[in-house]
A protein has these predicted regions:
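Generic N-terminal targeting/processing segments that precede catalytic cores or assembly contacts
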Residues: 1-227
Length: 227
């Protein structure tokens, strides 16, 4: 019976959608989810929530050369070995970064449910290359900052970091290279006591989900790497 604000869901989908500027993939997709089940009149019904996000800008022929020349750092070669050369190379198959679209859809719905219980989530670009943004205050994060970050297409606490970050991405692009970065995420309004011992702890469950996003190579909680 929870009522979903679908416009807010679409706002989050638009933030993820590619093709908006040079810091993202040039492929253009609207990322419009079509709900098949689990929602009636914007209210969750209790049935499994299922939506389809169609690919509209497809050029399958562009991937033909990857059968003989796999992309460095991508799944092409490992998928070739794992599936005995039967893998679908078009668009990366089920290893494609496009699969972050359904993650964003599910997250946008879950975020609204959590907010109704007083739990708020936000994230920002912490660094790109050697350019860094300011960090969250470890003791107090106000709602205005959370709202600002959640509506931004290039989420930063210190907006003066945007230009040097974009310049770093552009320099890497012109050099036909890539560049790494980090994201800092905060959760407010949650009580202690969630999770289970050992393998089902909150950090372990979150880490498993985060590593489902392509290109993630590390995660820390609090000041984990600095201690």
């Amino acid at each position: 019976g929870f009522e979903v604000d679908f416009d807010r869901v679409l706002t989050q989908m638009a933030r993820r959608a590619p093709g908006k500027d040079k810091t993202a993939t040039p492929r253009k997709e609207k990322d419009l989810p079509k709900v098949l089940s689990g929602m009636l009149g914007n209210k969750l019904t209790g049935a499994p929530l299922c939506a389809v996000i169609e690919n509209t800008n497809t050029k399958s022929g562009d991937y033909g050369n990857l059968l003989d020349c796999p992309r460095p750092g991508h799944s092409d070669y490992t998928a070739f070995v794992k599936y005995n050369a039967s893998n679908d190379i078009r668009g990366g198959g089920h290893f494609s970064g496009r699969l972050t679209a359904p993650i964003v859809f599910a997250g946008a719905v879950c975020r609204q449910i959590l907010e109704s219980k007083g739990v708020k989530i936000a994230a920002h670009i912490s660094s790109i290359g050697n350019v860094s943004d300011s960090s969250f205050c470890p003791t107090e994060i106000d709602d205005a900052l959370i709202e600002k970050l959640n509506s931004s297409s290039f989420a930063l606490i210190d907006e003066t970091a945007e230009k040097p970050m974009r310049d770093a991405v552009e320099d890497a692009r012109m050099a036909q290279d890539s560049i790494g970065g980090t994201i800092e995420c905060c959760v407010t309004g949650i009580d202690a006591g969630y999770g289970e011992p050992m393998f089902e702890g909150v950090e372990g469950v979150i880490a498993k989900a985060v590593f489902g996003v392509p290109a993630i190579k590390g995660i820390e909680f609090g000041k984990g790497f600095e201690l």
